[in-house]
Amino acid sequence: VVKPAIDSGITVVCDRFASATSAYQGYAGGLGTSTVEWLTDLATDGLLPNLLLVLDIDPAIGFLRKKGDTLDRIERKPTDFHQMVRQGFLYYAEQHPDFSEVIAADGTLAEVHDRVTQVANERLNLNLSVLGL
């Protein structure tokens, strides 16, 4: 689905891709990041993003911001697991600096929006508007 869209000139935005697989299964899940990245590379035929934005926040703060009371299977895992997932995303970004950017997500929604917009503008040569709040 992704590759044909890219090949036809469509811009694809994903909220989960290789970094999530590496962080959840490889780093926090114990399979090892090198094994998971090898399998992901095989499955995606080496496809990598132009830009990966890692919105970094302490999991405890993230859970306080979560809307609704229902937790899914992953959200019910212990805090240690979520800390490992966070470290997994940061590790992935560190290993892929050419296309990765870590953004502090501990500010207000407007502040995080502006950080994301500024990085996207710089890295992708765009001219998106910031909220400026």
List each model region and its residues.
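Phosphate-binding/switch loop-helix module in NTP-utilizing enzymes
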Residues: 1-12
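NTP-dependent small-molecule kinase module
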Residues: 60-133
